[in-house]
Amino acid sequence: MLKGIDPRLNADVLYVLRAMGHGDYLIVADTNFPSDSIARETVYGDLLRMENITAGEAAEAILSVYPLDTFVDDFACRMEIVGKPDEVPPVQQEVQDAVDAAEGEPRKMIGVERFAFYDMAKDAYAVIQTGERRFYGCVMFRKGVVPPDA
């Protein structure tokens, strides 16, 4: 156990979040996402797990230590609902709320078509599978930078 670090972040997840560099991106996936097979194609190459928590809870924990990229529009993306690309289901709204809280202001996640999201995920640094059972609980976070102390 460590002080000041969200206990939902296990050692493997913390290692990967720290190892990632500016512009690398992370997939946070629900239980229905083909996480294991896609994770094998990522930079890290193994599936990470944050089981027994929702996508929103995972996002909250991850974003407590992980800076989002402020230089790009696609700092965070969500998998679009097939046939309803503009609809944001509650599971994605919970993640959006975590993003807004971490950023201190509203920053809207960009929608990505389902199969395009799968393709994007293969180029990610890593995939974290959560315990989220609601459909479309899949998002991407692009890593930003931590500025130097003033």
Protein language model features and the residues they cover:
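Glycine-rich, aromatic-bearing surface loops/beta-hairpins
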Residues: 83-150
